[in-house]
């Protein structure tokens, strides 16, 4: 079992090698400049590596890029083996990264929240308070109220 630092270094190396080969070494038109390697994770035994990628474009370009990565998997693995210098070259698995879609969804939700906040702000622009503007007692009011309460208590005792 390898230590975490070694697995992290190997994952970083795999990410760099795969990204460089996609830019310069692979001549597949499906793997144009719209494929980005976002992250790489290596198992503890350094035998398997998961490469996360994003594709800028529509669903057809995503499917084409996925097929292109699967066809170039052997070439990419051999390049990783040359660069890594480990006893066993990790098996590469390509997984489309869901982070951009999740971020886009969160941005849409935040936009909806901003719009609803703006509607509430517009609706409350001409509104007035149901009671007084400041419903809380002030310290000088508390003193006068407590004196009246003490006098009322004294009168209640004498009435009995």
From Swiss-Prot:
**Localisation per UniProt entry:** Cytoplasm
What Pfam families does the record point to?
Answer: RBFA
Keywords from the named record = Cytoplasm, Ribosome biogenesis
Asked whether the UniProt record includes DNA-binding among its keywords, one would answer no
Binding partners and assembly: Monomer. Binds 30S ribosomal subunits, but not 50S ribosomal subunits or 70S ribosomes.
Answer whether the UniProt record assigns the keyword Nucleotide-binding to this protein. no
Q: List the disulfide bonds.
A: none
Protein name listed in UniProt: Ribosome-binding factor A
- Segments of skewed composition (Basic and acidic residues): 112-122
**Which spans does this entry mark as compositional bias, Acidic residues?**
141-160
SUPFAM superfamilies hit by this protein: Ribosome-binding factor A, RbfA
Which residue ranges does the record annotate as region Disordered? Answer: 112-160
Mind telling me which GO cellular component terms the entry cites? cytosol
GO biological process entries: maturation of SSU-rRNA; ribosome biogenesis
Span of the secretion signal?
none
Which gene holds the coding sequence for this protein? rbfA
What is a single molecular function from GO for this protein?
A: ribosomal small subunit binding
Say which domain of life the source belongs to: Bacteria
Function, in words: One of several proteins that assist in the late maturation steps of the functional core of the 30S ribosomal subunit. Associates with free 30S ribosomal subunits (but not with 30S subunits that are part of 70S ribosomes or polysomes). Required for efficient processing of 16S rRNA. May interact with the 5'-terminal helix region of 16S rRNA.
What is stated as this protein's family in its record?
Belongs to the RbfA family.
Taxonomic lineage of this organism? Bacteria, Bacillati, Actinomycetota, Actinomycetes, Kitasatosporales
